[in-house]
């Protein structure tokens, strides 16, 4: 009983370790209701001012020389996504080496070499020589292109002491094959916000843009666990 239980236990441990390693190769799936991307509400609720019967009421004033752009915590900003990235790389290398050497011996242990070899009838010679050649060539190319367009409306999460706005938010779209997600977070200058309260994603500093999805369509674009094993660093070949 003990001889059979040890191999079975070893196989079980090896299987669990393999499953754990393969699961580590899987990219984390985005989930809804992430508290980090939840809408940020103003820290101090605005209290309704009492109506005193006057024409001009407190709390309803507007700046005659400005516009209604976001500049407070909880304000809303629409970010226009216009991301286009393209990268290409090529490398070529070639190395070659040729070598020729020869050694000629006219004496052995102080005695001259005879030219009459009684064995085989050939002359005796200890001359040696070799030729060597080595050539290495390599060629590599890589190209990648990405594009993301659209718009996401986010909220101001914080206002830095220098007036920079920290914004973040997300958009979930439920389709017939699953959910599509767009998340964005970064830093925005108030001067870069247009009069219609929009800002381009190219003007966001330290931008974190995520486009992902869940459902059948997202699952089919991911390789299975068996394929991930052959594509992982664990595969020795």
Swiss-Prot record:
InterPro entries reported in the protein's UniProt record: Flag_Lring
TM segment ranges: none
Gene Ontology cellular component annotations, sorted alphabetically: bacterial-type flagellum basal body, distal rod, L ring; cell outer membrane
Cystine pairs: none
GO MF terms held by the record: cytoskeletal motor activity
Lipid-attached positions, S-diacylglycerol cysteine: 25
Places the protein is found: Cell outer membrane; Bacterial flagellum basal body
BP GO terms, sorted: bacterial-type flagellum-dependent cell motility
HAMAP family for this protein: FlgH
Alphabetized NCBIfam families for the sequence: PRK00249.1-4
Name of the featured protein: Flagellar L-ring protein
Source organism: Pseudomonas syringae pv. syringae (strain B728a)
């Amino acid at each position: 009983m003990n001889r059979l239980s040890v191999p079975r236990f070893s196989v079980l441990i090896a299987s669990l370790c393999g499953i754990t390693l393969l699961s580590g190769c899987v990219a984390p799936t985005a989930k809804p209701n992430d508290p980090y991307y939840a809408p940020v509400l103003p820290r101090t609720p605005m209290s309704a001012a009492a109506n005193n019967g006057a024409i001009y009421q407190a709390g309803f004033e507007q700046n005659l020389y400005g516009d209604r752009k976001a500049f407070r915590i909880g304000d809303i900003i629409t970010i226009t996504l216009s991301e286009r990235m393209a990268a290409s790389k090529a490398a070529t290398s070639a190395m070659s080496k040729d070598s020729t050497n020869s050694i000629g011996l006219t004496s052995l242990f102080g005695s001259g070499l005879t030219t009459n070899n009684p064995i085989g009838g050939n002359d005796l010679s200890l001359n040696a020589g070799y030729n060597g050649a080595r050539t290495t060539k390599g060629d590599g190319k890589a190209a990648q292109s990405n594009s993301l367009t659209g718009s996401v409306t986010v909220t101001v999460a914080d206002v830095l002491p220098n007036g920079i706005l920290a914004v973040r938010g997300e958009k979930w779209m439920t389709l017939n094959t699953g959910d599509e997600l767009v998340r964005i977070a970064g830093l925005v200058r108030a001067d870069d916000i247009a009069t219609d309260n929009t800002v381009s994603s190219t003007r966001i500093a330290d931008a974190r843009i995520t486009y992902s999805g869940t459902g059948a369509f997202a699952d089919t674009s991911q390789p299975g666990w068996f394929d991930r094993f052959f594509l992982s660093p664990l595969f020795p070949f």
